[in-house]
Amino acid sequence: MRSSVRRGAIAAPVALVLGLGVGACGVLPELPDPVPSDIVPSRAVTFAPQGGEQLSPDGFDAVQRMAVRIRNVGCAGLSTGSGFAIDEHTLITNRHVVADSETLEVSTYDGQDLEVSAASSARLADLAVVRTLDALPSYPELAVGDPRTGDAVSVVGYPEGGELTVTAGEIVGTTTDPLHENLGEVLITDAAVEPGSSGSAALDADGRVIGVVYAKTSDGRSLLVPLSTLQDVLADADAFTALPPCSS
């Protein structure tokens, strides 16, 4: 879901649209049964906080404040993606969002630019960590475990590199990760995502992180790296390598 201006239009529908980048697609095996065939992606909704005590002085909820827009200025062009804070100076996003970058530009919900100090990407999963010198305005809690089929899910990100949106849906199943089979299962949700949504946080009904958006299927479903995988990768000191400079 990295939105890019350096590639052509998305090709004909395939089983998986890798990263949801404009023109960045890969032909992969169809998702295995059973997966409901009558799921319709939900439309974008306006986030309505559950309680006024969660609002910041500027009127934005903590869930909105933790999401960031990531601009990848690479040797070959410009692309955009999303990310979210997990502590005051650490962001989670996708590996393909930050790959081949010359400069990473991070901005918050209110347009504030944050200086990036370092970035690293996971060797196996489509995950990356970005460190910022400037403090991030908010970060969410992590859920106690992975969600189950039927659980509510919201995706918070910056589709097309534009305004912050929150889309709602539910977990509709699981599948073997079509890109990284050794990592086991990933989650399938019908919450709507678009190019630029890669790296968005997927949240449960209580606003806790349950996964990371990384790809979209040709029938409009979204794939999530589950929380358990994210936690396992973050706990492995050897799982990440420093982001190499792009090649010109």
Name each model-derived stretch.
Residues M1-A15:
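N-terminal export and membrane-targeting signals
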Residues G21-A24:
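C-terminal motif of bacterial Sec signal peptides marking the signal peptidase cleavage site
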Residues G26-F60, V209-S248:
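C-terminal cap/linker of serine protease catalytic domains
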Residues E53-P57, M66-E88, N94, D113-E115, ...:
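A conserved glycine-rich beta-strand in the N-terminal activation segment of trypsin-fold
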Residues F60-V63, S117-R131, G162, G173-I188, ...:
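Gly/Ser-enriched beta-turn/beta-hairpin loop segments
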Residues A76-T80, D87-T165, T241-L243:
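Conserved active-site neighborhood of the chymotrypsin/trypsin-like protease fold
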Residues F84, A192-V212:
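Catalytic nucleophile loop of clan PA
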Residues S138-G184, E194-S197, Y214-S222:
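Flexible, gly/ser-rich surface segments that form the specificity/activation loops bordering the active-site cleft
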